[in-house]
């Protein structure tokens, strides 16, 4: 069972934490833990901790024991936090869209020997990955998702 450390417990983040907690230990960090649903607060596989995602030292300390990190923060916060996660040597899935060029972090990821899956949000993120895969296998002329 993996130890998944998740930063961000908004509407989508809470849903992801519940899904992940079905087979893993989830450590969920957010600044607004009072706003988190009772379903999260009472889940036996989710540990809820107050973490200020804008405080890099708190983020670094929070993810220290993580097997993998899920970043689920608003896009304007994501780039700086993603850089910190990479520099801590943690594999990460980022479900946020970031206005910055994520490829600027590629060298950091290589140097820290980590895998970064970025822009992997529910939609359009995951459908883009699905489309990309199928487009390598066959010619796609139309693609719709709902």
Predicted regions and their residues:
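Conserved N-terminal Rossmann-fold NAD(P)-binding element of oxidoreductases
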Residues: 4-8
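Rossmann-fold NAD(P) dinucleotide-binding segment
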Residues: 61-63, 76-95
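Rossmann-fold NAD(P)-binding glycine/threonine-rich loop
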Residues: 95-118
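Conserved anion/nucleotide-ligand pocket segment
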Residues: 132-146
């Amino acid at each position: 069972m993996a130890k998944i450390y998740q930063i961000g417990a908004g509407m989508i983040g809470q849903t992801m934490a519940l899904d992940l907690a079905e087979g893993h230990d989830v450590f969920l960090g957010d600044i607004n833990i009072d706003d988190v649903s009772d379903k999260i607060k009472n889940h036996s596989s989710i540990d809820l901790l107050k973490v200020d995602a804008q405080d890099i030292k708190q983020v670094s300390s929070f993810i220290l024991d993580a097997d993998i990190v899920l970043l689920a923060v608003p896009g304007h916060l994501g780039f700086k936090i993603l850089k910190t996660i990479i520099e801590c040597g943690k594999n990460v899935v980022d479900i946020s869209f970031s206005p910055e060029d994520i490829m600027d972090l590629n060298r950091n990821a290589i140097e820290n020997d980590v895998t970064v899956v970025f822009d992997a949000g529910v939609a359009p993120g995951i459908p883009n990955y699905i489309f990309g895969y199928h487009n390598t296998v066959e010619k796609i002329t139309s693609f719709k998702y709902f």
